[in-house]
């Protein structure tokens, strides 16, 4: 779904001033990635980058070119896991948060057994 510029600006502005919102963006991006919602994960990452460190500072911190970072989180981005993790790690450090994975059982009717 295409977002209007004003909505993106609103998200970016809120991320700049709200630590809990920044943490939630990172959490949602990671959850989207784990759920296979890669377009959503990239979009959330882009919002988080724009609302926190910005692409120039992220490029310096991760030693990845700005244009590569922008492509990574763009609509057709296909970041390597190594680069994605490097970006997440830096965003977490900048936001002062860390992540952990919690494994939970699925509903019995939603998975197949061998």
Regions found by a protein language model. Name each.
Residues 81-98:
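DNA major-groove recognition helix of helix-turn-helix/homeodomain DNA-binding modules
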Residues 77, 97-114:
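Short, charged recognition helix plus adjacent turn
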Residues 52, 76-77, 91:
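The DNA-recognition helices of helix-turn-helix-type DNA-binding domains
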Residues 50-70:
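Short alpha-helical DNA-recognition segment
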Residues 22-48:
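Short, Lys/Arg-enriched anionic-surface-contact patches
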Residues 65-68, 76, 80:
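Short coil turns linking two alpha-helices in DNA-binding domains
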Residues 1-19:
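General nucleic-acid-binding
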């Amino acid at each position: 779904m295409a977002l209007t510029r004003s909505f993106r600006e609103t998200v970016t502005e809120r991320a700049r001033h709200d630590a809990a919102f920044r943490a939630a963006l990172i959490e949602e991006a990671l959850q989207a990635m784990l759920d296979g919602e890669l377009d959503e994960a990239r979009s959330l990452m882009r919002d988080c980058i724009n609302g926190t460190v910005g692409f120039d500072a992220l490029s310096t911190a991760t030693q990845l070119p700005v244009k590569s970072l922008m492509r990574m989180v763009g609509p057709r981005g296909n970041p390597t896991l190594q680069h994605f993790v490097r970006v997440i790690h830096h965003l977490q450090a900048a936001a002062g948060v860390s992540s952990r994975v919690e494994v939970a059982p699925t509903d019995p009717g939603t998975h197949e057994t061998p």
